[in-house]
Amino acid sequence: MGFLLSICKRPSQPVDVDGEPLDVVVDYDPIRVSEKGMLLEQSQSPYPALKKKKKNKEAIY
């Protein structure tokens, strides 16, 4: 059972093919979700964007 646990145990730090530890903060930028990025993705999409209708918030008496 100990052998199986030693195989399944993940390393505490990600490593590359050679076994050297990777510095994730320096090597890879974090994925940022912004309105500008989302608009660019929507404009490049092959599907037409669905337009949302704004509801009138004023109460009709």
UniProtKB/Swiss-Prot annotation:
Membrane topology classification: Lipid-anchor
Keywords assigned: Host cell membrane, Host Golgi apparatus, Host membrane, Lipoprotein, Membrane, Myristate, Palmitate, Phosphoprotein, Virion, Virion tegument
Keyword Lipoprotein (UniProt): yes
GO terms for biological process, alphabetical: viral budding from Golgi membrane
Name of a matching Pfam family: Herpesvir_UL11
Residues covalently joined to lipid (N-myristoyl glycine): 2
InterPro entries in the record: Herpesvirus_CEP3
Chief subcellular location: virion
Modification comment: Myristoylation and palmitoylation (probably on one or more of the nearby cysteines at the N-terminus) enable membrane-binding and Golgi apparatus-specific targeting and are essential for efficient packaging.
Top-level taxonomic group: Viruses
Gene Ontology cellular-component terms listed: host cell Golgi membrane; host cell plasma membrane; membrane; viral tegument; virion membrane
Cell compartment(s), UniProt: Virion tegument; Virion membrane; Host cell membrane; Host Golgi apparatus membrane
Function: Plays an important role in the cytoplasmic envelopment of tegument proteins and capsids during the assembly and egress processes. Also participates in viral entry at the fusion step probably by regulating the core fusion machinery.
Subunit composition and interactions: Interacts with cytoplasmic envelopment protein 2; this interaction is essential for the proper localization of each protein to the assembly complex and thus for the production of infectious virus.
Family: Belongs to the herpesviridae cytoplasmic envelopment protein 3 family.
Protein name from the UniProt record: Cytoplasmic envelopment protein 3
Source organism (scientific name): Human herpesvirus 8 type P (isolate GK18) (HHV-8)
Underlying gene: ORF38
